[in-house]
């Protein structure tokens, strides 16, 4: 019977995680169509010939929604470890998390009142 130590399993995982993408790229390179010419360099746009210029201005609403999403996504990243270790942490950590959430609620109310969440 082959018994792995803790680091052997990590080494096998690292090797496999490096090998799988290399193997997938190699296989796709070998079985790809071998065409050449101008058709290969055209942009694929849902099976339709592309129309218009690709450099267009996006509405600022997209950026505002993205910014608000990033703020609350980062909040989730910071609150998840706190929620996992909630039982081991004391009252001080709970109060700190409440202050953190309160600051983000104030930011959400500010964005809402400024109209950053309005689509019209």
Swiss-Prot record:
GO cellular component, alphabetical, reads: NADH dehydrogenase complex; plasma membrane
Question: What is the uppermost EC class here?
Answer: translocase
What quaternary arrangement does the UniProt entry report? NDH-1 can be composed of about 15 different subunits; different subcomplexes with different compositions have been identified which probably have different functions.
Molecular function GO terms recorded: NADH dehydrogenase (ubiquinone) activity; quinone binding
Which protein family is named in the record?
Answer: Belongs to the complex I subunit 3 family.
Query: What residue ranges are annotated as transmembrane?
Result: 11-31, 64-84, 89-109
| Membrane topology term | Multi-pass membrane protein
Pfam families from the UniProt entry: Oxidored_q4
Reactions catalysed, semicolon-separated, are: a plastoquinone + NADH + (n+1) H(+)(in) = a plastoquinol + NAD(+) + n H(+)(out); a plastoquinone + NADPH + (n+1) H(+)(in) = a plastoquinol + NADP(+) + n H(+)(out)
Which source organism does the UniProt entry give? Gloeobacter violaceus (strain ATCC 29082 / PCC 7421)
EC number(s) stated in the UniProt entry for this protein: 7.1.1.-
Q: What does this protein do?
A: NDH-1 shuttles electrons from an unknown electron donor, via FMN and iron-sulfur (Fe-S) centers, to quinones in the respiratory and/or the photosynthetic chain. The immediate electron acceptor for the enzyme in this species is believed to be plastoquinone. Couples the redox reaction to proton translocation, and thus conserves the redox energy in a proton gradient. Cyanobacterial NDH-1 also plays a role in inorganic carbon-concentration.
Which HAMAP family does this UniProt record tie to the protein?
Answer: NDH1_NuoA (MF_01394)
Q: What is its main location?
A: membrane
Q: Which domain of life is it from?
A: Bacteria
Its recorded name reads NAD(P)H-quinone oxidoreductase subunit 3
Q: Does the keyword Thylakoid apply?
A: no
Provide the protein's localization: Cell inner membrane
Record keywords, A-Z:
Cell inner membrane, Cell membrane, Membrane, NAD, NADP, Plastoquinone, Quinone, Translocase, Transmembrane, Transmembrane helix, Transport
GO annotation, biological process: photosynthesis, light reaction
